[in-house]
Amino acid sequence: MSVRVDTPDAVGLAVDSHVEPETVKARGYWELVWIRFRRDKIALLSFGVVVLLFAAAFAGAPLAAHLLGHGPNTIFDYGTNPTTFTPVGPWSHISAAQLGQDPTHFGKTLLILGADGQLGRDLFLRILYGAQVSLEVGVFATFGSVVLGVIMGLLAGYLRGWIDTVISRLIEIVMVFPYLLFIIALKIVAGPALNNVTLGFLPKGVFTLALIFTVFGWFYPARIMRGVVLSLREKEFVEAARMTGASDLRIMRSHLLPHLVAPIIVYSTLIIATNILAEAGLSFLGLGIDLPTPSWGNLLSTAPDYYRTQVWILIFPGLAILITTMAFNLLGDGLRDAFDPRSTI
């Protein structure tokens, strides 16, 4: 009588034969980008800060004005000390009697961050409405410069020849042009007329600054896009498109432009931070947004008069600029790492 003995190898083969083959799900490009971005805690935090900034500027500002019962340009006589004429500090209350209302009226006005200067305007509301101005200048100027830069970079990088030469020389001219002197001259010659251009929905001065930043800022994205297109124009998919008879315009629009989405997104966030900082600097010097329209820069311009005693007038607008520019820069760094295929998942 023979006895059948199953060896370990035989048992293993029998078990394995009943196991379903494991399927590996391929991850798409944007899914990989999201996974890399999600694992960067600093980038996620920066994105949250940027979202909060937009919410505070465009939803929080009108809501706060409604709840407080006054606007950013409302002047309060009791917003300044009647003896020293210095602005009141944070969390100051102005009673109904001081507002000229019936003293028995229950209502009173709260200045959360104090007043902004000798006019006694609400610093908190002016910072919120100043965020609208800074973000509008940053976003619109970045949109204009990126659109113009992408067009110029595509033309120069793909067509080459005399077009590349002309655009490259134009980039060099714009890079070295003293745009600050141009802004000063423009402010003197046509300042009031340009500041009144609002397009029906922008604060005064925003369109002018956005236009100037576009004209003198497109060279940066143009140089980046030109370099990317130069590295792509000899790839196989471009050669295949040429062999099928696709026109240059179709190749640039349908084959090259989709590959520029990643650098466009990354560098747009960095350019927004640069434009916000430039607007604040010009407004501080009196060359940007004019009073009474609130801007972080022109809020800081009044701070030197009170920096020894009312230091909050310097601290709060300065913190707003610091947090905003840092958030956009860190977000740009995180997006750059997320779009980099060499980054680990």
Regions found by a protein language model. Give the residues of each.
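Gly/Trp-centered helix-boundary motif
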Residues: 1-146, 150, 154-155, 162, ...
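Alpha-helical transmembrane segments of integral membrane proteins
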Residues: 119-345
